[in-house]
């Protein structure tokens, strides 16, 4: 791919413009390769949010929209780079190259493997601009390359998670390449293997399908679950540690990190309550994905509302709780009189349902509240079966 000076100038001058409007003005700019310009402008706009350290570099090339939307964000790529170390790295599913770029910065040599020629051309162009001259780009199929490659310290791969009809998958065996089928070969080629998976995949099923998982990292960014990472190694471990991470992206919160094992979850003591106290807690998205419900109640001085509610309460604020904390203002049932007394002054609220016999939409219709504002309303069930609406504000 080549970009002419005229097109490069157009990209710089219009990098914040609406690409749909630009597409309609193509005839006004006969010397500009408009399809390429639109792809690059759209890429820069996504990068401004997703890869901020790259977005100000004029010479970075971006792929078509679909590939960019599927790639990692900078914050998750940086986190992954803290988990691997060694001299040599091979990325078998290169893609746009964000993960490879941040991982390779920690290695003396790296190989990027990608079967799409256009993505390889983009990666080969971008890596030197990022001062990553030690990455060797290979335009090959990842599985074929794996079979013939020499051993390295670490392998990274991000299997495709779409089925033949474009639907989302829940099992590793439905992904391409099939890591379960390749597990022994992968570990013959590297002492450590990192597999990046969609958070939509079933973690319990993944741990049954793979025999050599040592650690699991569930990564959220601003409380949105983004990635499921499995670290495979040749040495066996008695218990698989599960790391639940919530990363800040706006610089306004601290990283939250909680580690547990499935064995600890089964054995942890959990106190339940029939009465709300002063504060309410909602675990972050990584904890909810991991199922660390009893472990959280055991690790922090909080009580669980109900075995299936996944909400917690305490008398004194627990500032270190890995999730969102709220100050409880009031509580009520769905009784009309109680609703009026507790919520009568509200016009809008953020509503969450946890173990409650109504959807958010049904509740909004019944209590006539629009979305938004500073008030949070949790509809849940206490341990004695009592249904409650809990009015809160952020602690």
Region roles according to the model:
Residues 1-395:
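SAM-dependent transferase fold signal centered on methyltransferase-like domains
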């Amino acid at each position: 791919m080549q970009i002419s000076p005229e097109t490069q100038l157009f990209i710089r001058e219009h990098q914040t413009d609406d690409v749909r409007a630009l597409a309609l003005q193509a005839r006004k700019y006969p010397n500009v390769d408009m399809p390429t310009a639109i792809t690059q402008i759209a890429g820069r706009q996504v990068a401004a949010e997703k890869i901020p350290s790259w977005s100000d570099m004029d010479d970075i090339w971006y792929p078509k929209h679909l590939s960019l939307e599927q790639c990692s964000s900078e914050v998750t790529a940086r986190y992954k780079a803290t988990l691997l170390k060694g001299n040599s790295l091979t990325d078998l599913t290169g893609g746009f190259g964000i993960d490879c770029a941040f991982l390779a910065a920690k290695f003396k040599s790296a190989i990027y493997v990608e079967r799409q020629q256009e993505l390889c051309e983009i990666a080969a162009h971008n890596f030197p601009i990022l001062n990553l001259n030690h990455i060797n780009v290979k335009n090959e199929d990842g599985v074929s390359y794996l079979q013939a490659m020499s051993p390295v310290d670490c392998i990274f791969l991000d299997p495709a998670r779409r089925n033949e009809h474009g639907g989302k998958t829940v099992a590793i065996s439905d992904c391409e390449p099939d890591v379960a089928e390749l597990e022994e070969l992968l570990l013959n080629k590297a002492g450590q293997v990192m597999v990046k998976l969609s958070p939509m995949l079933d973690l319990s099923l993944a741990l049954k399908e793979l025999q050599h998982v040592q650690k699991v990292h569930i990564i959220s960014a601003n409380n949105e679950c983004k990635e499921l990472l499995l670290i495979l190694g040749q040495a066996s471990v008695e218990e698989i540690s599960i790391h639940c991470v919530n990363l800040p992206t706006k610089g306004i919160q601290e990283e939250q990190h909680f580690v547990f094992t499935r064995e600890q979850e089964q054995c942890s003591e959990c106190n339940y309550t029939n009465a709300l106290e002063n504060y309410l807690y909602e675990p972050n998205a990584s904890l909810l994905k991991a199922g660390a419900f009893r472990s959280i109640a055991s690790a922090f001085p909080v009580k669980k509302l109900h075995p299936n509610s996944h909400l917690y309460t305490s008398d004194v604020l627990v500032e270190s709780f890995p999730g969102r904390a709220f100050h409880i203002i009031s509580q009520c049932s769905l009784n009309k009189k109680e609703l009026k007394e507790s919520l009568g002054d509200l016009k809008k609220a953020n509503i969450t349902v946890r173990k409650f016999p109504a959807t958010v939409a049904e509740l909004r219709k019944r209590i006539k509240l629009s979305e938004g504002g500073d008030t949070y309303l949790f509809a849940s069930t206490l341990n004695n079966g009592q249904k409650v609406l809990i009015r809160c504000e952020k602690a």
